[in-house]
């Protein structure tokens, strides 16, 4: 039904479309409620606004000019990251004030609870590879803390693949990107408890108006979720098999060491870690990464450790033939720079 209308010129009553697609997605995922938003970042901002505004018509229209005593959003310090924009900016857009719990290298359930005050409105948990992973409480632990303090737990799971795990772990609102693991259009998905999702939907007449999602995004994401739930998914072991010849080719290059590494956030994703001994290659890794973007094929890597001479290749969206092109291109750039 949703697929057929995508390719026609149709008019929609947007509130009705939001409600019906949300109910349909919620049924697909076996959750209480769901709604499509413009992106995961908008989902964070609107979720924060939702737990502050709730049913207040006044706050809906005057969120940023009305003092709100209970506006603190508690977040593990190691989750206060920049994912392309600061998490704190999204919280502030939603009217919240960020309060960090624990330390940059650890946050236990006790440390999270210690940051809660009478001014706390919600707990925010960021499930992302950008965040510190070691010595951090998991979503279930955060949910237990939230429940014991009668607070909602908001989980940003933008790039996560499991569309049910964090809801089942006790989160009240969970936010996903429509364009990452789901591979849909630029959009976001918010699922959760009925009351909280309804409060998020109210934000279409508040801050959400500036983050409005169109019918194309709503229907496109709905179709993408349908497909995502039924399509076969490449396992980590299949990724390893695909990248093994690629790694072997790279290990024949002087000063290059490649190996399989697994996703630091715990997902079933295998990647190729490529380490360059710059004393041997004579090439700065940052310069190499930039050069690889400039060829006939623009090749991009995960470059979070490029300053250490390490990059990672995510092979989920490429095939074996394309990996051959990548390894050949790396060899070409290294030889060119070394002989320059």
Regions found by a protein language model. Give the residues of each.
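Conserved PLP-enzyme active-site core in the AAT-like
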Residues: 1, 19-229, 233, 247-251, ...
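Short, small-residue-biased leader/transition segments that mark boundaries at the very start
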Residues: 2-6
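A hydrophobic, small-residue-rich beta->alpha segment in the mid-to-C-terminal subdomain
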Residues: 7-8, 291
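N-terminal glycine-/serine-/threonine-rich phosphate-binding loop
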Residues: 10-17
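Conserved PLP-dependent catalytic core of the aminotransferase class-I/II
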Residues: 229-262
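Conserved C-terminal alpha-helix-loop-beta "cap" of PLP-dependent enzymes
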Residues: 251-331
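Generic C-terminal helix-cap and adjacent flexible tail
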Residues: 332-340
């Amino acid at each position: 039904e949703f697929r057929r209308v995508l390719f026609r010129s149709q008019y929609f009553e947007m509130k009705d479309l939001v409600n019906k697609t949300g109910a349909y997605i919620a049924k697909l995922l076996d959750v209480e409620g769901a709604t499509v938003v413009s992106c995961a970042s908008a989902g964070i901002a609107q979720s924060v606004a939702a737990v502050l505004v709730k049913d207040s018509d006044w706050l809906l229209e005057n969120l940023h000019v009305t003092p709100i005593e209970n506006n603190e959003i508690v977040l593990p310090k190691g989750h206060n990251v920049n994912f392309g924009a600061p998490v704190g900016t999204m919280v502030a857009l939603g009217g919240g004030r960020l309060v960090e719990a624990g330390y940059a290298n650890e946050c236990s359930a006790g440390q999270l609870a210690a940051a809660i005050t009478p001014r706390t409105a919600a707990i925010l948990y960021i499930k992302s590879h950008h965040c510190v992973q070691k010595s951090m409480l998991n979503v279930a632990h955060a949910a237990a803390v939230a429940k014991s303090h009668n607070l909602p737990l908001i989980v940003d799971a933008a790039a996560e693949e499991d569309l049910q795990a964090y809801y089942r772990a006790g989160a009240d609102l969970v936010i996903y990107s429509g364009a990452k693991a789901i591979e849909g259009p630029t959009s976001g998905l918010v699922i959760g408890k009925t009351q909280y999702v309804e409060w998020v939907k109210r934000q279409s007449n508040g801050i959400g108006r500036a983050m409005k999602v169109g019918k194309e995004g709503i229907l496109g994401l709905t179709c993408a979720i349908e497909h995502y739930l039924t399509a076969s998914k490449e396992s980590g072991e299949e990724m390893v098999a695909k990248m093994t010849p690629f790694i072997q080719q790279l290990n024949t290059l002087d000063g290059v060491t490649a190996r399989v590494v697994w996703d630091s956030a715990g997902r079933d994703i295998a990647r190729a870690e490529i380490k360059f001994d710059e004393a041997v290659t004579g090439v700065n890794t940052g310069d190499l990464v930039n050069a690889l973007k400039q060829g006939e094929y623009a090749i991009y890597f995960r470059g979070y450790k490029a300053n250490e001479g390490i990059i990672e290749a995510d092979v989920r969206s490429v095939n074996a033939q394309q990996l051959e092109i990548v390894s050949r291109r790396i060899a070409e750039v290294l030889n060119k720079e070394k002989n320059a």
